[in-house]
Each structure stands twice: as C-alpha cells, then as structure tokens.
C-alpha cells in the first residue's frame, strides 16, 4: 500500500496507540468480558499492521483466526462462567500483585532504556515494497483460494461442519 509519509505515520501511531490501550484494557479491567473485548481490539490492531506492508492475506487470516475464532471462544467461555466467583474474597492488593508490578515495571524500564539508547538512524525504512514480492504474494494468496475452492473444498466444508457440531455440543453440555 503506497501511502504518503504523514498518513503512513498517522496510521502507525493510531494502530500503536490502539495496541497499547487494548493491552492496558486486558490487564487493568476487572470484568473478564471487557478484558476479552480489549483482547479483540489488540488482535484487530495487530492484523491491521499487515495492511501497510501489502500483506493483505495475512491480515485477513489474522482477523479470521484470532478475532473470529479465538477471541469469540474466549468470550464464549467467559460468559458461561459464574460471575460471582470473581468477586468473592476480593483483596485489594496481594503480595503476588506487588511482585508482578515490580517485575513488569523493571521490564518496562529496561525496554524504554533500550529504545532510547538505540541509534534508529542506521535502520533503512522502506515505504514501497518490491513489485516482484508483491506479485508473488498476490499469486500465493490466489493459489490458496483456488486450492481451497477446488481441490480441498470437501475437506474444508467437512471441517467447518465438524466445528459447528462441536460448538452446538458445547452449548448443549453447558446448558445442562
């Protein structure tokens, strides 16, 4: 994707801030449903990072697999849990929380120190991808689509039916 410099920079800053806010939401929100939705925001932002580098198939696969399957499964599992179990004997601050905060703060400080001490001027930033690589990516994703819709159509549909039956079975077992 050939974007002008300021738009490309704005997109990266926007997606990076979405990643940071979503990650903080996963860690800091006490309601597990809200944490799962924040994890979905993180997955969406990660998949959107692939679009400026002309990896559209990877972005679509990331959205389908992580947001469409894994995050929905996490939300599904959290919704079937008893919400009152989370709030019984809720201590405001424990020793484990203190140790975790010290470890995370030290990792964060070392990361910031590394970022500030790195010479970023020697890194070559590329904004346009090579046309040969772009053509290979397009042909590979087209080949995957052709194989899924012709050679592997029956196994692909059988797997989707098996997953649907497993999901219906899980719902039936959870309701009993």
UniProtKB/Swiss-Prot annotation:
Key words, A-Z: Chloroplast, Membrane, NAD, NADP, Plastid, Plastoquinone, Quinone, Thylakoid, Translocase, Transmembrane, Transmembrane helix, Transport
Enzyme Commission number(s) of this protein: 7.1.1.-
Catalysed conversion reaction: a plastoquinone + NADH + (n+1) H(+)(in) = a plastoquinol + NAD(+) + n H(+)(out); a plastoquinone + NADPH + (n+1) H(+)(in) = a plastoquinol + NADP(+) + n H(+)(out)
Signal peptide residue numbers: none
GO cellular component, one term: chloroplast thylakoid membrane
Cellular compartment(s): Plastid, Chloroplast thylakoid membrane
Translocase among keywords: yes
Keyword Mitochondrion: no
One Pfam match: Oxidored_q3
InterPro entries xrefs: NAD(P)H-Q_Oxidoreduct_6, NADH_UbQ/plastoQ_OxRdtase_su6, Nuo/plastoQ_OxRdtase_6_NuoJ
Spans through the membrane: 10-30, 32-52, 61-81, 93-115, 152-172
Membrane topology qualifier: Multi-pass membrane protein
GO MF annotation terms: NADH dehydrogenase (ubiquinone) activity; quinone binding
Subunit-structure text: NDH is composed of at least 16 different subunits, 5 of which are encoded in the nucleus.
Function in brief: NDH shuttles electrons from NAD(P)H:plastoquinone, via FMN and iron-sulfur (Fe-S) centers, to quinones in the photosynthetic chain and possibly in a chloroplast respiratory chain. The immediate electron acceptor for the enzyme in this species is believed to be plastoquinone. Couples the redox reaction to proton translocation, and thus conserves the redox energy in a proton gradient.
UniProt similarity note: Belongs to the complex I subunit 6 family.
Protein name: NAD(P)H-quinone oxidoreductase subunit 6, chloroplastic
Organism: Vitis vinifera
Gene this protein is translated from: ndhG
